[in-house]
Amino acid sequence: MVIFAIWARRDLGRGDESYYLAGRSLTGPILLVTMAATNFSAFTVYGSSGASYRIGLSFLPIMAFGTGFMAVSMYILGRKIRSRSVQHGAMTAPEMVMGQTGSRSAQLTMASVLVLATIPYLALQPRAAGIVFSALFGGPDWIGAVLVTLLVVAYTLTGGLKAVVRTDAVQGAIALGLLWLGLAMVVNDAGGISTAMDAISSSESTEELLGREGNYTLLIWVSTMVLWLFADPMFPQLYQRLCAAESDAAIGRMATLYPAVAWLAFIPPILIGTIGHLSYPDLDRAGSDNILPTMIMDVGGEWLGGLVLVAGLAALMSTMDSQLLATGSLVTRDLLDKESPEDWSRESVIISLSLLGLALSVWSDLSILDLGLLAFSMYAVMFPSVLASAHFDDIDGRAVVASILAGEAVVILAVFSPESFSGWWVEPVRGAVPTAVIPSLFASLTGLVVTQRYFKMREGFSWRFKINNSDIAPLAGLLVVFVMAQDFWWWGETETWALGLPRWIWWSAALSIAQTAIMARWVGKVSSR
């Protein structure tokens, strides 16, 4: 990892566009690799394996199909924000909003919330590094957290997005290859996938791991997929890459192939976590985050198992560097006084953010899944105002502020007073945390529309989106795919099918294939216009 980090620092420019956006030069294949490596983080490896340990295979469609379908919103939003980014010289969402609305208040509000939302997600990475270090060497978690933080900060400070993208390519390949090696080892030790699934289904204590009843309600299922759809494009590090894309066609190719990468990334940790319940049936919520390294070390021994655990390090490093760079750009370009010395600001901000994330990872007792869901809910609230600002030229900055404050107020209420949701909604606690996204998005959208109407309707403002006739069919097809993914007709189904997996797993995979086909046709038509 150290050698690759040094190699990645070649031919780097020092201007902001080169440092933060790699000169807007990311082509389709590179964009796909860096988006995937950045998005598939410690949450992917340790959070998803821990969650599947607790709730079983129902977490696979939620993550693999759900994050794969998120590419649709990336494509719809990405083309417009890339254009606005070039138009305004913007490198962050708040900068784009400032360019469109002329409101410094809107810029400051959005940037502040994005930075606050990123801190708990940033803490996931050193938390996971500590897990790997402890599994490999038996020392305290905090040592691994500190060492990995130091390495990531070092090459991010000196390299910018070009260095991050180069390390993403290497780290992504390492993570994916070694995760599949780890899965092969665990499955072989269990006697094969079918044998492992049969053992799970034949025990009263584990049979619920092959079903959804008791693990999800339909509302939680739908809410979680909605959360991914609206939250992921608002991740500062993913938004930054959309701005850095070479063309709309590059974004289209990335969005088309993203579902395949999502399935490849989530199958290993989720299957390992589920199978791990056979060997370690009594882990608590926080302890279940360790199930993947524990299983791999058990079946692979210290050397081979340790090699596979490098996959976790590669995944978390490829996300942490991107988070530091993107969040640093929010602070230096949106929050700090423009008169501050540019290079000093970059370095001090990135170091400060890394220390905040490190501190939260060491002293917080929240699980990796808890930290991730908190950050995702805060991100999702940004989507309506960013989408509106990108598509309309006369959005009022006060409407953006109202939208953000209204939505985040609901998120804060969900965190500190979940009982307030009883009686009219679902208490957003534990597995039901994602349900907060629907009322928070409703509040955000209401704040945007009502405030915009109050200040702008007398000037003839219209909410009418311009949609090409050729876009209607693919949009309708993708909507059908999303609705079909909420397969309530198989909700109580636990009967296993091919490879011992429930049929609703295969159904979700088939829907991702359908999504890919629709996207390929749509992107091809748009590119030929």
Task: Describe the role of every protein-language-model region.
Residues 1-495, 501-502, 508-512, 516-525, ...:
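Membrane-embedded helix-loop-helix hairpins and adjacent transmembrane boundary segments
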